[in-house]
Amino acid sequence: MALRMPFNQAFWEEYLSGQDATLPSLPDTSTLSSRVIRILGGNPGAMHLQGTNTYLVGTGPSRILIDTGQGLPIWLSRIVGVLHSNNISISHILLTHWHGDHTGGVPDLISYNPTLGEHVYKNLPDAGQKPIEDGQIFAVEGATVRAVFTPGHSVDHMCFLLEEENALFTGDNVLGHGFSVAPDLGRYMESLELMAGLGCVLGYPAHGAVIGDLPSKLEEYIRHKEMRVQGILSVLVKERERVEGDRGTEGRRKGGMTLHEIARAMFGTVPDEVIDQAMAPFLMQALWKLTEDRKVGFEPGDPVKRKWFAVARRKTKPPRQHGSVARQ
Protein backbone atom coordinates (compact mmCIF):
# COMPACT_ATOMS: atom_id res chain seq x y z
CA MET A 1 0.00 0.00 0.00
CA ALA A 2 1.39 3.38 -1.01
CA LEU A 3 2.09 5.76 1.84
CA ARG A 4 0.99 9.33 1.29
CA MET A 5 3.36 11.80 2.89
CA PRO A 6 2.48 15.50 3.37
CA PHE A 7 5.53 16.84 1.57
CA ASN A 8 6.01 20.57 1.45
CA GLN A 9 5.76 22.01 -2.08
CA ALA A 10 8.81 24.23 -1.59
CA PHE A 11 11.00 21.18 -1.10
CA TRP A 12 9.75 19.44 -4.21
CA GLU A 13 10.24 22.54 -6.34
CA GLU A 14 13.87 22.53 -5.17
CA TYR A 15 14.45 18.80 -5.50
CA LEU A 16 12.76 18.33 -8.87
CA SER A 17 13.88 21.57 -10.49
CA GLY A 18 16.47 19.85 -12.65
CA GLN A 19 14.55 16.63 -13.18
CA ASP A 20 11.35 17.89 -14.79
CA ALA A 21 9.88 15.46 -17.31
CA THR A 22 8.89 18.42 -19.48
CA LEU A 23 12.47 19.33 -20.36
CA PRO A 24 12.62 20.54 -23.99
CA SER A 25 13.95 18.02 -26.47
CA LEU A 26 17.39 18.86 -27.86
CA PRO A 27 18.74 17.55 -31.19
CA ASP A 28 21.64 15.10 -31.06
CA THR A 29 23.76 17.67 -32.90
CA SER A 30 23.05 21.38 -33.38
CA THR A 31 24.80 24.30 -35.04
CA LEU A 32 24.17 26.96 -32.42
CA SER A 33 26.09 29.77 -34.10
CA SER A 34 28.68 30.26 -36.82
CA ARG A 35 31.30 29.31 -34.21
CA VAL A 36 29.63 26.70 -31.99
CA ILE A 37 28.37 23.17 -32.68
CA ARG A 38 26.78 21.20 -29.84
CA ILE A 39 26.94 17.40 -29.67
CA LEU A 40 24.90 15.64 -26.97
CA GLY A 41 26.65 12.93 -24.95
CA GLY A 42 23.84 10.38 -25.28
CA ASN A 43 23.45 10.12 -21.50
CA PRO A 44 20.11 11.72 -20.56
CA GLY A 45 18.88 11.29 -17.01
CA ALA A 46 17.83 13.00 -13.80
CA MET A 47 21.38 14.16 -13.04
CA HIS A 48 22.35 15.00 -16.64
CA LEU A 49 19.13 16.54 -18.00
CA GLN A 50 19.10 15.90 -21.78
CA GLY A 51 22.67 14.61 -21.55
CA THR A 52 26.11 16.19 -21.34
CA ASN A 53 26.67 18.97 -23.86
CA THR A 54 29.98 18.89 -25.71
CA TYR A 55 30.98 21.73 -27.99
CA LEU A 56 33.14 22.20 -31.08
CA VAL A 57 34.28 25.83 -31.24
CA GLY A 58 35.78 27.79 -34.14
CA THR A 59 35.16 28.49 -37.83
CA GLY A 60 38.17 26.98 -39.57
CA PRO A 61 39.37 23.45 -40.31
CA SER A 62 40.68 23.02 -36.74
CA ARG A 63 38.29 23.33 -33.76
CA ILE A 64 38.45 23.38 -29.96
CA LEU A 65 36.43 20.67 -28.20
CA ILE A 66 34.95 21.49 -24.79
CA ASP A 67 34.13 18.36 -22.73
CA THR A 68 33.81 14.80 -23.98
CA GLY A 69 30.67 13.32 -22.45
CA GLN A 70 30.45 10.15 -20.41
CA GLY A 71 32.27 7.80 -22.75
CA LEU A 72 29.29 6.22 -24.50
CA PRO A 73 29.80 4.82 -28.03
CA ILE A 74 26.90 6.90 -29.36
CA TRP A 75 28.74 10.11 -28.52
CA LEU A 76 31.91 9.05 -30.34
CA SER A 77 29.81 8.11 -33.36
CA ARG A 78 28.10 11.50 -33.30
CA ILE A 79 31.23 13.60 -32.99
CA VAL A 80 33.14 11.61 -35.61
CA GLY A 81 30.19 12.13 -37.94
CA VAL A 82 30.30 15.89 -37.34
CA LEU A 83 34.05 16.00 -37.93
CA HIS A 84 33.76 14.08 -41.21
CA SER A 85 30.72 15.92 -42.55
CA ASN A 86 32.33 19.31 -41.90
CA ASN A 87 35.86 18.22 -42.89
CA ILE A 88 37.27 19.49 -39.61
CA SER A 89 39.59 18.21 -36.88
CA ILE A 90 40.16 18.81 -33.15
CA SER A 91 43.07 20.99 -32.03
CA HIS A 92 42.48 21.09 -28.24
CA ILE A 93 40.34 19.14 -25.80
CA LEU A 94 39.35 21.38 -22.88
CA LEU A 95 37.71 19.75 -19.85
CA THR A 96 35.58 21.89 -17.55
CA HIS A 97 36.21 19.58 -14.56
CA TRP A 98 36.98 16.03 -13.50
CA HIS A 99 33.49 14.50 -13.29
CA GLY A 100 33.07 11.38 -15.40
CA ASP A 101 30.21 12.69 -17.51
CA HIS A 102 32.62 15.32 -18.84
CA THR A 103 35.86 13.36 -19.12
CA GLY A 104 34.61 9.87 -20.00
CA GLY A 105 35.00 10.26 -23.75
CA VAL A 106 38.71 11.13 -23.66
CA PRO A 107 39.98 7.52 -24.04
CA ASP A 108 37.65 6.94 -26.99
CA LEU A 109 38.85 10.09 -28.73
CA ILE A 110 42.47 9.08 -28.24
CA SER A 111 41.70 5.62 -29.62
CA TYR A 112 40.09 7.29 -32.63
CA ASN A 113 43.03 9.69 -33.08
CA PRO A 114 46.10 8.94 -30.92
CA THR A 115 47.63 12.37 -31.63
CA LEU A 116 44.88 13.95 -29.51
CA GLY A 117 46.49 12.48 -26.40
CA GLU A 118 48.95 15.37 -26.44
CA HIS A 119 46.22 18.00 -26.51
CA VAL A 120 44.00 17.25 -23.50
CA TYR A 121 43.81 20.14 -21.01
CA LYS A 122 42.32 20.25 -17.51
CA ASN A 123 42.85 22.22 -14.34
CA LEU A 124 44.58 19.94 -11.80
CA PRO A 125 45.36 17.55 -14.67
CA ASP A 126 45.36 13.78 -14.49
CA ALA A 127 48.26 11.74 -15.84
CA GLY A 128 48.96 12.57 -19.47
CA GLN A 129 46.91 15.77 -19.42
CA LYS A 130 48.18 19.34 -19.59
CA PRO A 131 47.26 22.00 -17.01
CA ILE A 132 44.92 24.91 -17.58
CA GLU A 133 45.79 28.18 -15.90
CA ASP A 134 43.28 30.86 -14.99
CA GLY A 135 43.22 33.34 -17.87
CA GLN A 136 44.95 31.00 -20.32
CA ILE A 137 44.02 31.62 -23.97
CA PHE A 138 43.24 28.92 -26.51
CA ALA A 139 42.82 30.19 -30.07
CA VAL A 140 41.80 28.74 -33.41
CA GLU A 141 40.44 30.39 -36.52
CA GLY A 142 37.31 32.31 -35.57
CA ALA A 143 37.50 31.64 -31.84
CA THR A 144 39.45 33.01 -28.89
CA VAL A 145 38.67 31.04 -25.73
CA ARG A 146 39.80 32.23 -22.28
CA ALA A 147 39.84 29.93 -19.25
CA VAL A 148 38.15 31.24 -16.09
CA PHE A 149 38.74 29.43 -12.78
CA THR A 150 35.37 28.99 -11.08
CA PRO A 151 35.57 26.42 -8.25
CA GLY A 152 32.75 25.32 -5.99
CA HIS A 153 30.90 22.68 -7.99
CA SER A 154 34.29 20.97 -8.08
CA VAL A 155 37.76 22.01 -6.95
CA ASP A 156 39.05 22.18 -10.52
CA HIS A 157 36.07 23.74 -12.29
CA MET A 158 36.77 25.98 -15.27
CA CYS A 159 34.44 28.04 -17.40
CA PHE A 160 35.52 29.17 -20.86
CA LEU A 161 34.82 32.62 -22.30
CA LEU A 162 34.33 32.86 -26.07
CA GLU A 163 35.43 36.42 -26.74
CA GLU A 164 33.98 36.73 -30.25
CA GLU A 165 30.44 36.07 -28.97
CA ASN A 166 30.75 37.50 -25.45
CA ALA A 167 29.53 34.05 -24.42
CA LEU A 168 30.49 31.79 -21.54
CA PHE A 169 30.70 28.00 -21.49
CA THR A 170 29.40 27.64 -17.95
CA GLY A 171 30.21 23.96 -17.32
CA ASP A 172 28.19 22.60 -14.40
CA ASN A 173 28.17 25.91 -12.50
CA VAL A 174 25.05 27.11 -14.31
CA LEU A 175 22.67 24.74 -16.10
CA GLY A 176 20.14 25.34 -18.84
CA HIS A 177 17.35 24.14 -16.54
CA GLY A 178 17.03 23.99 -12.77
CA PHE A 179 19.91 24.51 -10.38
CA SER A 180 23.33 22.95 -9.89
CA VAL A 181 24.89 21.56 -6.72
CA ALA A 182 28.10 22.64 -5.03
CA PRO A 183 30.07 20.77 -2.35
CA ASP A 184 31.83 24.05 -1.49
CA LEU A 185 28.98 26.55 -1.37
CA GLY A 186 31.13 29.49 -0.28
CA ARG A 187 33.51 29.22 -3.22
CA TYR A 188 30.64 28.41 -5.56
CA MET A 189 28.83 31.63 -4.68
CA GLU A 190 32.06 33.56 -5.15
CA SER A 191 32.38 31.93 -8.57
CA LEU A 192 28.84 32.92 -9.51
CA GLU A 193 29.66 36.53 -8.62
CA LEU A 194 32.86 36.31 -10.67
CA MET A 195 30.93 34.91 -13.63
CA ALA A 196 28.39 37.72 -13.37
CA GLY A 197 31.22 40.24 -13.39
CA LEU A 198 32.47 38.97 -16.76
CA GLY A 199 29.49 40.60 -18.45
CA CYS A 200 28.80 37.73 -20.85
CA VAL A 201 25.38 37.80 -22.49
CA LEU A 202 25.05 34.20 -23.68
CA GLY A 203 25.62 30.95 -21.81
CA TYR A 204 26.52 27.53 -23.20
CA PRO A 205 25.91 25.14 -20.28
CA ALA A 206 27.23 21.61 -19.87
CA HIS A 207 23.65 20.39 -19.43
CA GLY A 208 20.47 21.81 -20.90
CA ALA A 209 19.51 24.39 -23.49
CA VAL A 210 21.45 27.53 -24.41
CA ILE A 211 21.01 30.32 -21.85
CA GLY A 212 19.88 33.35 -23.85
CA ASP A 213 20.10 35.83 -20.97
CA LEU A 214 23.05 34.78 -18.85
CA PRO A 215 23.05 37.84 -16.56
CA SER A 216 19.45 37.13 -15.51
CA LYS A 217 20.19 33.44 -15.01
CA LEU A 218 23.20 34.23 -12.82
CA GLU A 219 21.15 36.68 -10.78
CA GLU A 220 18.52 33.96 -10.32
CA TYR A 221 21.17 31.46 -9.18
CA ILE A 222 22.76 33.89 -6.73
CA ARG A 223 19.41 34.96 -5.28
CA HIS A 224 18.25 31.34 -4.99
CA LYS A 225 21.31 30.25 -3.02
CA GLU A 226 21.26 33.33 -0.80
CA MET A 227 17.59 32.77 0.04
CA ARG A 228 18.19 29.13 0.93
CA VAL A 229 21.16 30.00 3.16
CA GLN A 230 19.23 32.81 4.83
CA GLY A 231 16.31 30.45 5.38
CA ILE A 232 18.52 28.01 7.27
CA LEU A 233 19.98 30.80 9.39
CA SER A 234 16.50 32.12 10.19
CA VAL A 235 15.42 28.70 11.44
CA LEU A 236 18.41 28.51 13.79
CA VAL A 237 17.96 32.08 15.00
CA LYS A 238 14.31 31.39 15.83
CA GLU A 239 15.31 28.25 17.71
CA ARG A 240 17.86 30.18 19.74
CA GLU A 241 15.36 32.90 20.55
CA ARG A 242 12.83 30.27 21.58
CA VAL A 243 15.05 28.65 24.19
CA GLU A 244 16.92 31.67 25.51
CA GLY A 245 15.71 32.55 28.96
CA ASP A 246 16.70 35.40 31.17
CA ARG A 247 19.62 37.77 30.71
CA GLY A 248 21.96 35.30 32.38
CA THR A 249 21.82 32.94 29.42
CA GLU A 250 22.64 35.46 26.73
CA GLY A 251 25.75 34.61 24.74
CA ARG A 252 25.70 30.94 25.69
CA ARG A 253 25.19 28.08 23.22
CA LYS A 254 21.46 27.76 23.70
CA GLY A 255 19.22 25.58 21.56
CA GLY A 256 20.58 23.81 18.55
CA MET A 257 19.04 21.58 15.90
CA THR A 258 20.08 18.48 14.02
CA LEU A 259 20.14 18.36 10.23
CA HIS A 260 16.82 16.51 10.19
CA GLU A 261 15.22 19.04 12.53
CA ILE A 262 16.37 21.91 10.34
CA ALA A 263 14.99 20.21 7.24
CA ARG A 264 11.59 19.63 8.82
CA ALA A 265 11.43 23.17 10.16
CA MET A 266 11.95 24.44 6.62
CA PHE A 267 10.01 21.93 4.53
CA GLY A 268 7.53 20.21 6.81
CA THR A 269 7.15 16.45 7.32
CA VAL A 270 9.83 14.73 5.25
CA PRO A 271 11.04 11.12 5.72
CA ASP A 272 14.57 10.56 6.96
CA GLU A 273 15.65 8.84 3.74
CA VAL A 274 14.53 11.78 1.62
CA ILE A 275 16.41 14.20 3.86
CA ASP A 276 19.55 12.05 3.72
CA GLN A 277 19.50 11.45 -0.02
CA ALA A 278 18.05 14.65 -1.44
CA MET A 279 18.26 17.48 1.06
CA ALA A 280 21.28 16.86 3.26
CA PRO A 281 23.92 17.80 0.64
CA PHE A 282 22.71 21.38 0.24
CA LEU A 283 21.87 21.79 3.92
CA MET A 284 25.40 20.74 4.85
CA GLN A 285 26.91 23.05 2.24
CA ALA A 286 24.91 25.96 3.62
CA LEU A 287 25.70 25.14 7.26
CA TRP A 288 29.43 24.98 6.58
CA LYS A 289 29.27 28.29 4.74
CA LEU A 290 27.43 29.87 7.67
CA THR A 291 30.04 28.38 9.99
CA GLU A 292 32.83 29.92 7.91
CA ASP A 293 30.96 33.23 8.09
CA ARG A 294 30.83 32.81 11.91
CA LYS A 295 27.05 33.00 11.94
CA VAL A 296 26.52 29.37 12.96
CA GLY A 297 28.33 27.00 15.31
CA PHE A 298 28.00 23.32 16.09
CA GLU A 299 28.55 20.92 18.94
CA PRO A 300 31.28 18.31 18.37
CA GLY A 301 30.35 14.66 18.23
CA ASP A 302 28.36 12.29 16.08
CA PRO A 303 27.69 14.07 12.73
CA VAL A 304 24.22 12.50 12.51
CA LYS A 305 23.20 13.81 15.93
CA ARG A 306 25.24 17.01 15.79
CA LYS A 307 23.46 20.15 16.96
CA TRP A 308 23.85 23.34 14.94
CA PHE A 309 23.07 26.69 16.53
CA ALA A 310 22.97 30.35 15.58
CA VAL A 311 25.85 32.32 17.07
CA ALA A 312 24.56 35.10 19.29
CA ARG A 313 25.43 38.58 18.19
CA ARG A 314 27.58 40.46 20.64
CA LYS A 315 25.94 43.54 21.99
CA THR A 316 28.01 46.64 21.48
CA LYS A 317 28.44 48.93 24.45
CA PRO A 318 27.26 52.52 24.00
CA PRO A 319 30.13 54.96 23.50
CA ARG A 320 31.52 56.36 26.73
CA GLN A 321 30.75 60.01 27.22
CA HIS A 322 33.55 62.37 28.10
CA GLY A 323 33.52 65.78 29.68
CA SER A 324 31.50 67.31 32.50
CA VAL A 325 28.14 65.94 33.52
CA ALA A 326 25.42 68.40 34.41
CA ARG A 327 24.15 68.00 37.96
CA GLN A 328 20.61 68.59 39.06
From Swiss-Prot:
Binds 2 Zn(2+) ions per subunit. Zn(2+) 2 binds at residues 101-102. Its EC number is 3.1.-.-. It comes from the Eukaryota. Pfam families: Lactamase_B. The active site is at 101 (proton donor/acceptor). Pathway: Secondary metabolite biosynthesis. InterPro entries: LACTB2-like_MBL-fold, Metallo-B-lactamas, RibonucZ/Hydroxyglut_hydro, Sec-metab_biosynth-thioest, WH-like_DNA-bd_sf. It is an enzyme of class 3 (hydrolase). Keywords: Hydrolase, Metal-binding, Zinc. One of its GO terms (biological process) is secondary metabolite biosynthetic process. GO terms for molecular function: hydrolase activity; metal ion binding. Its cofactor is Zn(2+). Zn(2+) 1 binds at residues 97, 99. Lactamase-like protein; part of the gene cluster that mediates the biosynthesis of neosartoricin, a prenylated anthracenone that exhibits T-cell antiproliferative activity, suggestive of a physiological role as an immunosuppressive agent. The non-reducing polyketide synthase nscA probably synthesizes and cyclizes the decaketide backbone. The hydrolase nscB then mediates the product release through hydrolysis followed by spontaneous decarboxylation. The prenyltransferase nscD catalyzes the addition of the dimethylallyl group to the aromatic C5. Belongs to the metallo-beta-lactamase superfamily. This is Lactamase-like protein nscB. It comes from Neosartorya fischeri (strain ATCC 1020 / DSM 3700 / CBS 544.65 / FGSC A1164 / JCM 1740 / NRRL 181 / WB 181) (Aspergillus fischerianus).
